[in-house]
Amino acid sequence: MTGLASPALSERKVLLAIREGYLDPRLLAAARNLCQRLGAGLDILLAFQGKQLPAEVADLVKTLRDEGVAYRISQFDQLRRRDVVQYANTHECIATVVIDSLEGWERIARSRSSNPWANLACPLVTAVPPKQVKERT
C-alpha cells in the first residue's frame, strides 16, 4: 500500500518496523514525529498475519495522508532483525530506523548470538524503554 505526498517532500524516509504483538502507541508516535522533524516519508515493514491493518496502523496511515506524508507499507508473515537491517541498508533514502525495542527480536532469529543491528548503516531509534516491552495478544 502506498500513499502519495506533496512534491515538496524530500526523498528521505524513516523506516518503521512493526512486529505483531508489539504494537505500542509510542512506536507510532516516534516514527511520525521523526518524519515531521526530518521532512521525510515513512516506509513501514509490518509483521502481521491478518488481512486488515491493525486499527492503530490504519489511524497512522490516515494521519499521514492528512498531513501529506508519503508512505509505503510492506506486510510480512514474520520480521527478523536481519530483514530490517537489509531493507534499511539497501535503500539509500532511509535516514533512520524505528523499532519498539531491542528486546524480543532473538525469538525468531536464526542466530541468537549475532547482532545485525551493529551492521545498520543509519541511526536506530527504540521507542519503548527496555523492560517495558511485552508481547501482547
Language model: regions and residue ranges:
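Short, well-structured alpha-helical segments in soluble
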Residues: 61, 84-92
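Short acidic active-site motifs
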Residues: 56, 79-85, 112
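Small/aliphatic-rich secondary-structure junction motif
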Residues: 3-58, 65-67
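Structural motif
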Residues: 17-21, 47-49, 75-76, 99-103, ...
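Gly/Ser-rich helix-loop-strand patches that form or flank binding pockets
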Residues: 89-137
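A glycine-rich helix N-cap at a beta->alpha junction
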Residues: 59-78
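SAM-dependent methyltransferases
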Residues: 1-11, 129-137
